[in-house]
Structures are given as C-alpha cells and as structure tokens.
Amino acid sequence: MRIILLGAPGAGKGTQAQFIMEKYGIPQISTGDMLRAAVKSGSELGKQAKDIMDAGKLVTDELVIALVKERIAQEDCRNGFLLDGFPRTIPQADAMKEAGINVDYVLEFDVPDELIVDRIVGRRVHAPSGRVYHVKFNPPKVEGKDDVTGEELTTRKDDQEETVRKRLVEYHQMTAPLIGYYFKEAEAGNTKYAKVDGTKSVAEVRADLEKILG
C-alpha cells in the first residue's frame, strides 16, 4: 500500500501516520530523514546532496526523486510506504509519475485554517521532558506549569501565530494545488483519493482511515 498524505501543517497528519505505519506495516518516508540518511551513508546520491546543502542551496527535485526511488527499493518498503512532505508541488508530482513511482491512496486531511491556528498556537511544552499540553484541549493542572515537575511551560518558536499563518499561506500557494492534481489522477483511475475530516477526534479519524484503507 503506497500512500501520500496531504494537508496543512497542524492538520493531524503526524498522529495518523503513526497509526497507519503500525497497522499496515509500512515505513514513513520523510524527505528530510531520507536526505540525512543518504548524506550519512556516503552514497553517490548522498554526496551530491551534501555538496548542494553545504553550498546553502535547495536539493533539486531530480535528486530527491532519485533518493525516493532508491529508498522505496529497500526491503522494508516491499508492502508499501507512506510519503509525508513530498511531493509538495505539481512538478514534483509529475516527476514522481514519470519515474514510475505509483501511489495507491492520496489522503487529504481537511481542517479549516482557524482551527489549525487554534490547535498550534495553544500548544505549550515542557522542554526538558517533551511533554506537550494545550491551553484549551489538554490544559495542565496549574496554568502555565508542568504537571509532573511544576516547572514553567514554554511556547515553541514555530508555534507562534505569525509563523503558523505564514506556513499556512505557503501551504495554500504551493501544496494545495496538488489536491486538484490528485483528484484528476483519481478520476483517471491512476490512484484513489479520499478527503479525511481532520476536525474529528483522533479516534474518529483513525476509524475513518480504517474504512478507507480497509
């Protein structure tokens, strides 16, 4: 089962990716992790990626596609894989198709922007332990304090409203057009496309995914 997850940052893809990986026994392929692993391995593609990144440039789509092809040929991908964070643009999706990387399901996590802002901006973390709270959905027992240690909770820089809104604008400009692209691909019979209501609870979304994926 080869799956692509689409959806804005904060739409709940990460939580459900864990569930899909465990239930269907497929690995999650994140381009960031893949690039780091390739550089570390010292492979030919890894060396190319390192040279580009050391020069402060963005890795080309061609190189990322080559890395994806190399990665999905590995033994743990024999039953499929879960792509998160790639493709991000229509040219990348086209390049994947041309490279013969077929996908069984494209899942779009649909959540209104304002709810995403609410979800992310309300996060509070206890940095030393990694415990995460939410002022509305999962508040600590004492406002602003960690339940276990009583230490101050902080807000991650990435969770500040201005940053979140900027990332949402980028998502709508760059990645949202993929929704139309894959909808057409599904109409042509090249993949299956499903919209998932990401405003539901984690358990409800999980149940919906089980219905979709079988």
UniProtKB/Swiss-Prot annotation:
It comes from the Bacteria. It catalyses: AMP + ATP = 2 ADP. One of its GO terms (molecular function) is ATP binding. Its EC number is 2.7.4.3. One of its GO terms (biological process) is AMP salvage. ATP binds at residues 10-15, 123, 132-133, 200. AMP binds at residues 31, 36, 57-59, 85-88, 92, 156, 167. Monomer. Belongs to the adenylate kinase family. This is Adenylate kinase. It comes from Shigella sonnei (strain Ss046).
